[in-house]
Amino acid sequence: MAQIKITLVNSPIGRIPAQRKTVKALGLGKLNSSVVKEGSPAILGMVNSISHLVKVEEA
């Protein structure tokens, strides 16, 4: 599977708890923090649920 780079660009403050937990589960903390993950269906589903908070690109 391809690797994807996920960057937190908008704050999870004021979002529903499930979205905040998803941000933490992906390993994102502060704004502009990035992680590289495998593009598995589970990770892609998590990214899709918080797509308005993150920027995704190929790593």
Curated annotation (Swiss-Prot):
CDD domains hit by this protein: Ribosomal_L30
A GO MF label: structural constituent of ribosome
Signal peptide: none
Keywords (A to Z) from UniProt: Ribonucleoprotein, Ribosomal protein
Pfam family, one: Ribosomal_L30
GO cellular component: cytosolic large ribosomal subunit
Biological processes per GO annotation: translation
Family, per entry: Belongs to the universal ribosomal protein uL30 family.
Assembly and interaction partners: Part of the 50S ribosomal subunit.
Protein name: Large ribosomal subunit protein uL30
